[in-house]
């Protein structure tokens, strides 16, 4: 397993296409999200010049995970798509970045998950950190999230915000991450969502997790 970081400005067209294809396979083909994107390629208006990416690769070199970081001084997903989740509390601060389009899924697992079981709403507003409990048994997922926090800290971030399903803060806390809700959860598109804040610091020694088999795919 290898995790690397790259900015959108540094990224060549070939790598951008690889990320877009991977995200399409995860979010559209596997999780069944209804996104406004061309067949085979998922990018949105937040994949702009100021975006940064974390990429997880298998030993074979195949892309098996990704995450996007956005500065809150620029337009970002929580601010533009989900402002109702943090009314009057939307950060616009160099020390706060947003985590979105977070996913960990091996190409061998593409299309194998039951879409009906996916926690994410099947619409463009479905930007969630993960697909419920089993995914947090994945050491790859924890490693990618910690790498995102470390990289964000190198960019000047002290905390990240992300749109998450109710309960994800508890799971993150159990995994050793320091989280809190910016505001009470709300129902959006039939799903209970909230704006989650994650501190950019090394995680604590986690409490033991008793989870099922891992099959990791998240968002946003």
Name every feature range the model reports, one short phrase each.
Residues 1-40, 53-57, 63:
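Short amphipathic alpha-helix that is part of the acyltransferase structural core
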Residues 39-45, 183-186:
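Short, solvent-exposed loop/turn elements at beta->coil junctions and helix N-caps
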Residues 44-54, 74-77:
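A short helix-loop-beta-strand connector motif used in the catalytic cores of GNAT acetyltransferases and
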Residues 58-91:
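Short, His- and charge-rich active-site/binding loops that engage polyanionic ligands
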Residues 77, 83-179, 183-193:
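Acyl-donor binding region in acyl/amide transferases
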Residues 190-211:
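C-terminal "cap" of GNAT-fold acetyltransferases
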């Amino acid at each position: 397993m290898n995790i690397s970081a790259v900015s959108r400005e540094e990224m060549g067209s070939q790598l951008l296409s690889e990320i877009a294809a991977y995200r399409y396979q995860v979010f559209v083909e596997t999780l069944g999200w209804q996104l406004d994107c061309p067949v085979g390629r998922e990018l949105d208006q937040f994949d702009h010049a100021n975006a940064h990416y974390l990429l997880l690769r298998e030993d074979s070199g195949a892309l098996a995970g990704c995450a996007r970081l956005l500065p809150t001084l620029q337009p970002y997903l929580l601010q533009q798509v989900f402002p109702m989740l943090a009314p009057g509390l939307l950060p616009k601060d160099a020390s706060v970045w947003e985590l979105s389009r977070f996913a960990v899924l091996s190409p061998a697992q593409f299309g194998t998950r039951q879409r009906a079981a996916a926690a994410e709403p099947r619409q463009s507003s479905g930007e969630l950190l993960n697909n419920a409990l089993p995914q947090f048994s994945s050491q790859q997922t924890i490693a990618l999230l910690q790498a995102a926090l470390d990289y964000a800290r190198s960019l000047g971030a002290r905390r990240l915000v992300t749109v998450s399903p109710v309960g994800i803060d508890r799971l993150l806390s159990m995994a050793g991450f320091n989280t809190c809700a910016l505001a009470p959860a709300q129902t959006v598109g039939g799903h209970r969502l909230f704006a989650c804040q994650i501190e950019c610091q090394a995680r604590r020694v986690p409490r033991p997790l008793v989870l099922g088999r891992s099959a990791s795919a998240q968002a946003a």
